Amino acid sequence: MITKKNEQDNDIYILGSDVQKEREKITAKRMWIALFICLVIMILAVIFVIFSSKEQTPEYYFEPEEMLQQSISIITANDENQNQKGYIKMQEETINDVPLLLYIPHKATMSLSLGVPDKSDSTIIFTTMAADIRRDNKKIVGDFVLSGKQLSRGTAKKGFCAVIDKTISIGMGEDTPLLQQAVENNGFFFRQYPLVHNGQLIENKPKNKSIRRALAVRNEQVIMVESKNIESFHDFSQALIDIGVSDAIYLVGGDAYGWYRNEELVLQEFGKEKTDFPENTSFIVWQIK
């Protein structure tokens, strides 16, 4: 016979069993939720590793390959009649109302010099200023190599020209193996604004207008180009592309001094000759051997 006390004890026992079962259900549910969250985290981690490794691949592998394609190289003074004298052919071309002067070297090789070249040296058939110098300390702007000696460092201007033996390379980029090759092979190297790279116009910050000059590649030949009128960087670069230039870097413009010798070897000057050039003034020099 069940007494009231036994009934109460039994009620209490049954109530305790229900609570225990409920707690077990809650615990199991929490475990499943925790396992699900862990699974989601693991999946997300795997996805992150896969995609992050893909994004880093260009920096690790493709960048060096791209760097090797950043310049164009032209061998000079190798395809002409050996009995013909070297000279500069000057011709005018106008494209989209932008008149240009083209200086085309024949039977000559290019190098660099510090200081104004000797005007009386008849073997020099073209010269004009190459790298910029700082206004405050008169030092050369950017990497500069003269006969294998690196006289200046820096990449403020991304365009470059390297001359190694008879090969002229024009390109664009902060890093290039051609810099070290110029040092190791008694070569030449300087930096300037890039104007055209692989047929594409390169924008530059200066927005003023001036007489513009460029060292350029057209039809696998290195030429110098000068604007007859004052032009912006953009319009000058576009004109270079329009006449078929594939790659070009800037040469000092404005009234920068220089000269060339025509087919009769008559000296023709341009710009303004100063009585006192800063000692770090650099020139490209085309010379016949």
Model-identified regions with their sequence ranges:
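Active-site-adjacent helix-turn-beta-strand microarchitecture at beta-sheet edges
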Residues: 128-129, 134-200
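Pepsin/retropepsin-fold aspartyl endopeptidases
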Residues: 56-57, 188, 246
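Short, surface-exposed charged micro-motifs
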Residues: 91, 160, 214
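Zymogen propeptides
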Residues: 2-153
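Beta-strand-turn-beta hairpins that frame and shape the catalytic cleft
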Residues: 96-98, 165-167, 217-223
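A general structural motif
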Residues: 199-209
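Conserved, well-ordered active-site substructure
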Residues: 138-155, 208, 217, 221-246, ...
